[in-house]
Amino acid sequence: MIIEERKNHELNLESIDRDLRMENVRQSAEKLGWEHFARSVRRNLLEKRQTLDARTRLDVLGSLVFMKEHLPIDNDATIARKVQQLSEGLGEHCVFSTQNSGFSIRNPDVTIDIGVAEDQISTCKIGYFGQPLTDAPGALALMKNGEFSKLRDSITAILSSLPKEITLSEKNACKEAFRALDQLLIRDAADSSFTAINTGKYGFYAPRNELRSGRIYYVAEPVLIRLAEKEGKTKADASYLDLLPYIEISFFKHDKPSKLPVFTQTGEWSTFNDANVCICVRFNQGFLLSQQTIRKLSHIVPKSPLVRNYVNFYRYMTGRVGVKSNLKLLTQFPDEGDIQQQYQVDSKMLTKEDDVVAMEMYLSDFRDLSKLIETLRSEWKHASLWESILAICESSKGEQKEVNAVDMQLVLRRTEFFLQFDTDYGSMTMQIFEKSPSNYVVKTTSQITGESPSLDFDKMLTEKLNSTWSIPATLTFAITDLKCRINSVLNCVISFDSSSSSDKQHQNYWSISNNNTQLMQSAAQKSAAKCTKKKVTVLEVGPAIEPTQLVYTRENDEEFQGSLLSSFGEVDDYYVKTSTIGRTRPQPRPKREPNQLTSMDMMSAELDKSRHTMEGSMRDAQTSSFLDAARVRMKQSIGAAHAVGLASHQPPASPVAAAAAAPGGPMRHNSYPSGFEPPPSVAPYDFPADPSKKQRKQRAKKQPGEEPPAGRGKGGKKGRGAGAVGAAAAGGRKSAGGAGENPFGMDPMRPPMLQRSSSEQHNPNPHQMSQYQMQQYQQNQQFRMHQMQQQQQQQFQMQSPKNPLVPAYTDEDSDEECDPPPPPKPQVSTSSRMSSVPSHPPPPPQQLGNPMVGYPGMPLQSPNHLPLTPSPLSAPPKPFSPEQQHHFGMKMRETSYWKELERLETKPDVEKLKQQLSSSSSSSQAEASDPPSTSTEAQDPPKPSSSSAPPPPKKKLGLEAAISKIRGQQEQALQKQLQQQESVESELATPHPGSSGAPPLAPHQVNRARNLNDIFDDEADDSSPTADIKPSLQALQKPTDTSSQSTSSEPPPKKEPADEQPEREKEKLILKIPKMLKPVVDDRREDRKERDRDRDRDRDRDEDREKVRDKEDKAQREKDKKEKERERRRQRDRDRTEQKKSDREKEPSKKRKLEKKDEKEKDRREPERKKGKSDGKEYSKASTTSLIPTLSLKNFRIPKKDTVEEEKKDVKEEAPGPSSSTESKKEPPSAAPITRKESTTAPVAPAVQQQQQRKESFTALPSLPEQQQHHREPLLKKKPPLQPPPPPQMTGPPIGIYPGPPAPGNLPGSSRPSGNRKQPLPPPPPMIRGPPPDQMYRDRSGGGGGSMRGGFPPASHYHGGTSGVNKQVASYAQGLPPGMGPPVVKPHGNNYQASQWVRPPTHRDSSHSYHGMPSLGPPQLQREPPAPPPPQMIPLPKDPPVLREHPREHRAHRGGADDDGPDSPEEGTLRIDDE
C-alpha cells in the first residue's frame, strides 16, 4: 500500500492526528511522575485484563528496578532532587536524609556525605564496604559539573563487585578478601615501570578510588615503551595507563565454595574462609584465548570463561575471517632496496574455530592469580608476534610492481612459529618457540647438516625478537647473513586464491594507517566495479544470488549502505554451487494439513542436496551392480536395510514397459493388470533423473524368476504412530523405487500421512471389499507358496495335528508384521485371477484375518488407503527374519491394542457366546485330536489361516477371553476345512462355507477378539528372565497334550493309527510356514535388562509398601496388646471378685469357662471336620462357612515353618482317592467368563477343588503344610489336649505328580528345604512334592516369566488357550463369596514351561503386600484371573493363646537368612485390604 506524502502539512490530517497523540502523551507524562510509574503500569495491565504469573511479575519488578537505577538524572532539578535520584539509583536499600550541612546517603555497602554551602555542593566523602569515609575529589568534580548520572554509574560499578544474592556472612568474607588482596598488591605490585609491568609477578596494581575498582596492568607493548622512552618516561603515568590492557577483580556467585584469605596486619595469608563465590577476573576488552591456553587453565578455573564469540585465533587477527586456505602475505618495507618477505601460511591452523574471545575468567583461589597473569602475558605475546607479520604486510599503495622477496613457508602453532626458506647453503629452517612463558628463543637449522650454522647468530636473533616482538624485523638480520635466495614477485601483499570460484580471483590488499588494520579493495577490483553500472536487487539472500550480476564495492555502494547485502564482500562459493537461478521448477503441490508428522520435514533438507547430483550418478548406477547402487543410496541418508532391499531388485526388462506401468499418482484410482510386473528402469533411486521434471511413481513389478527384496526400514524396529505403520506396510513404496513422485511436497523418506479408520473408507461396499480382500489374499498365497515349497519337508517335522501351538499357518508369519499389501485389483474377476494359479486355490472371499481389515492402529495401512493407493511392491518381498518380525510386531501390537480398546465399545452378547461355546465343546468331544469343531465354522465369517492357531501366552480382558476361545476354535476348524479342500479340490476355487442357523458375530467383535489374541504375543515370550534357554518344540508339545487332556470334560478317546494316516497325507499338502523363533541373544539380553529394571523398581515399591504395612502392623499389635492388657485386668478383677464367693460358686464358674473355650476351639476346628465328608458336600460347606467372617481380614494366619514336619506325617497318612485324581482333571468345557450375578448360582465345588489341586502342584518344595487347611488357627506348639483333627482327604492328582513340561535339568535348586524365600524358585520339575507355605498366596498364577509385567500364566494352559487381561483380585479379597469371583481355571500344574520361573517374595513378610491393591501390587496378583483358595474365615477366640513356650526357638527363626516365617502371630497373618 502506497501512502501519499503531502507537501502541505497544514492540510495533512495524519500529521495533525500524530501531533495530537504526542501532545496527549506529553500531558500524561507530566501527570505521572516516577513515583507513580509502577502504579500506572499495573493499572494499564489491569485495564487490558492481562494477568501475570509470579515469575513474570518478578521479571517486571526487576525491569522496573533496572530502569529506575539507570534513568538519567534530571539536570534541571534542584540539588536536593538530584541527590535523591542519585540515592534511588544506588538500590532500594539506600536511605536518603537531609541534614543541616547537606545530604547523607546510607547503604549497607557505601556511605556518602555531601556538604552544601550557599546552594552549591562544597564537599563529598565516600566510604565503601564499611571502611571510613575519605575525600572524593573526583566525585565532587562530577557533581559540580552536573554529571550525577556518571557518578551514579561509577558507584554502581564498584558496588557490583559483590553479588547481591550471597548471604551476609559470605559478603563479609568477600570484604575481608578484598582487604587482604589490596594489602598484598600494594606491597608487591606498586612499581609502575614498564619493565615491572611485563616481568613482575602481579604487574602493576592501581588501587581502588572513589570512582573505579582496583586495576592490575599486566603487559605493555614494546612499541608503546619506545614512545614513552622518546618522551623520557620510564614509568607509566595516567595517560599511558589508559592505553594498556588491565583486569579488575570482583566476585561472582557460585555453587561451590572458594578459598578467600582473611585480612591480617602482617599480610600473610594463613587462614581462609569458605564462601559460595568464585573470583571473577574481568578484562577491559575482549581477550583472545586459544583452545590450548584454555585447556592449560582448566585445572585452576571453577567454571568456563564468559565467551563473547568463538573464532579462529589466526583468522580473527587478520580481519578476514572467511579466509581458510591459500593465505600469502608480502611485507611492505618502505625503502626501495629492502628485500621483502613473502609468507605462504599453512592452512591447517586456519580451519578450526575453537578459540574464544573471552570477557571474563574465573578463579577459585586468590593464590592462582599470579599463574593466570603469567598465562595471559604469554598469550598476548604470541598474538603480538603473529600481528607483527600482519601489520607489516599492509599497504596503502594501490600500484603493483615487481619487488625482490624471499619465499618462506610459515607453519603456525601455539608454541612456535616454524619457517622454511632456501639459501645458498641449502634449505634452512627457523624455529621461534617459547622456552618459558613470554620468553621466545630462535633456532636455525640446516637441512643438510642438521645443525645450527652459528649459535651466536641464534643468540643475536633471540635478543632482537624479545626486544622488538616482531618476526619480520628479526628476519631482516638473517636474510643477508644466511644468503637467502631472492625471487622477483609482484607486490600484492595478501592474495586469496579461491579455488572454488572459476570466474576470477579476488585480490585484496592490506594498508597500514595509524597501526589500525583496515581491509581495502584492490585498485583493479575498484576499476572493474566502476565499469559495471548494473546492480541487481534480490529478494532472497543466499542461493538465489547470481554472482555474475552482483558486482559492487562497499565504499561507493550508497544504495546498499547498512543493509544485509553490504556485509558480503563477494559472493561465497557455496552460493555459486547451490544457486537455482535458471533452473527453476514448477511450484510444488500444497501440503496437507499439519499433523504429528510435520516434524519430519527436517529430513528433506539433507535429501534435497542429493537432487543436484542425481543426473550423473543415475547413469552410473544403471551400469553398476545393484549392491553398488544401494551403497550409493546409503550415502544419501538411507538406512542400510532399505539399501539392501533396493539392491535385491533385478535389472528391468524394458524401460518403456516400466514407464507405461505408472498411469496414475498415489492418490488416484488405478486398475492393475494381472500378474507381476518388472521393476521400473531406475529402481534404486527415489528422485527423477532430471530435477526439473516430475514423474509419476512407478509400481514395482516382479519377473518370473525374481526374488523379492530382503527387507525394508532400519534396524528391524518400527517407529511410533501411523508413520511407522505406513513404513512397515508400504516400505516397498520407497525401496521398490521408480522415479518417485514427491506428492504434496513431502520428502520421499518421510512416512505417509495418518490413515483413517475403516468407517471413513471412500467405498464401503461390502461386496467390493470382500472381492478385493479375496484377490489380495490370492496374491499373497501365490508368492508365499512359491517361496515355501522347499521348506515343506523341514516344516512338516515341526508340526503335528495334535500341536495347536504350531499351526500350518500362524499369525506371526502373516503380512501384518513384515509383508506389504499387494495392489488392489477390483476390476479383475476372480476366475481370471485363478487361471494364473490353478494349483493353489484361493481362500474364501471374506478374510477377517486380512491385514487390511481391522482397526486404525493395526500394523499395516487402513482399508481407506488400499483401494486408492497402488502398492509399489506388487512383487511381495521376502519374509523378514524371525528377529525382524519380532521387533516389528512387538511395539506396534501394543500400540494398536490400546487404540482398539478405546475404539470398540460394543460388547458381545453373552447368550450368543454361550451357544457358540456349547457347540464348540460338543464338537471337541466328537473329535479328540482337534478341539475345534467344523460345525462352528458357519457361526462366524470365515477366517484365514493366518490367525487359526492360539498365539503364545497373552493377556485378555474380561469377556474377550471367551471371544478369543471361540475365535481360536473357529479358525482351527476353518484351517482344517481349507486343508481338506486344498487336498481334494486343488483345481477348483475355494467354495464359500455355508451359513448355519446361529447368527455370526459382528466383524468388529471378531476383529476385536482376533486383535486381543495378537496383542501380547511378544510380551509373553519376552517375559522370561531365562529366555536364552529355550525348550525344544517336542518339549512344548508334551505339556500341550497334557493340558488338552486336563481341559476336556472327559478323558479323550485315543485316535487309531488308521485315522492318523489320512491326516498325515493331508498335512503333506498343507503349505508349511515356519513359526516365529525367539529373539536373538542380544534382544533377549536387552529384554532381561528391562525386566530386571522393572523387577527392581517393583521390589523397591514393595519394600516401601512393606515398611508402611509394618508400621501399620506394629500399631495394630500395640493396639491389640493394650486391648489384651485391659482384658487381663478386667479378668483379674473378676477373678478377685469370684474368689470372695463361696467354694460352691467357684466350681461352676470354672466349668463354664472350660465349656466356653471348648466351644471356641470346636468352631475353629469345624472346617477340618467338614472336609472329611464327600467331595461335593465338603466344598459347598467350605464355601458356606467362608461367608461368615467375624474378624477383620487382617488376621488371616500364614503357617509357620515349625509345623511343616508334623503336617508331612498327616499328609502321608491320608492318600487321595482315585476319584479325586480323576475328578481333578475334569473341567467345564465352557470358557465363557461368568459374571458375579451368574456365579451365585454356579456350583462352587470345582472351583475349590481346583484351588486345592493348585496347592498340591504349585512349587517345588517337598511337602504340603497342614496349616494351609486351617491357617486361621493360631500357632499352638505345646498344647497336647487340643490336637487338631486329621486333615481332610486331598483332592487332585497324587501328591508329587506334576503334569507339567519335562525339563528337570533346567530347574536347579528345586529341592531346597521348605521356607527358603531369599532365592528365586525356578518352575518345579515333575515328581516333586507340594509348595512351601509362603508361596501359596504369592505367585498363585504360576507367573509366566520373571518380569513384573509378565507374571500371568501362559494362555495355552487355560480353557481354549485364552487368558484374561482384567486386573482381578481373589473373591475373598473383594469381600465376596468364593463363587463370585473370576471364572475358575484348571490347576497350575500344567501352567509352566521349561524356561519359566516363579518370582520369589522380595521380603520375609511379603505375604502382607499387594492383596486388594490393583494399582501397586505385583502383576502376578493384579493380572491373573484365577482366584486363590479362600482362607477359612472362621471366627477366632477373642483372646488367642500366646506362644510363650519356646521363645528362643521362635526367635531363632527370625535371624536366619533362609527364614521366611513371620515374627509373631500378628505378622503371620495374611493381610487383605478391602479397597
UniProtKB/Swiss-Prot annotation:
Query: Source organism's superkingdom?
Result: Eukaryota
Q: Which organism is it from?
A: Caenorhabditis elegans
Q: Any keyword Transcription regulation?
A: yes
Biased composition (Low complexity) is annotated at 655-666, 767-800, 829-838, 915-929, 969-989, 1037-1049, 1242-1252
- This chain belongs to the protein called Mediator of RNA polymerase II transcription subunit 1.1
What segments bear the compositional bias annotation Polar residues? 755-766, 1181-1193, 1308-1317
Quaternary structure, from the entry: Component of the Mediator complex.
The transmembrane segments are none
| Sequence ranges of Basic and acidic residues compositional bias | 1052-1070, 1080-1148, 1155-1180, 1199-1215
Keyword annotations from UniProtKB, A to Z: Activator, Coiled coil, Nucleus, Transcription, Transcription regulation
**Function noted in UniProt:** Component of the Mediator complex, a coactivator involved in the regulated transcription of nearly all RNA polymerase II-dependent genes. Mediator functions as a bridge to convey information from gene-specific regulatory proteins to the basal RNA polymerase II transcription machinery. Mediator is recruited to promoters by direct interactions with regulatory proteins and serves as a scaffold for the assembly of a functional preinitiation complex with RNA polymerase II and the general transcription factors.
Q: According to the UniProt record, where is the region Disordered?
A: 579-600, 645-894, 908-1475
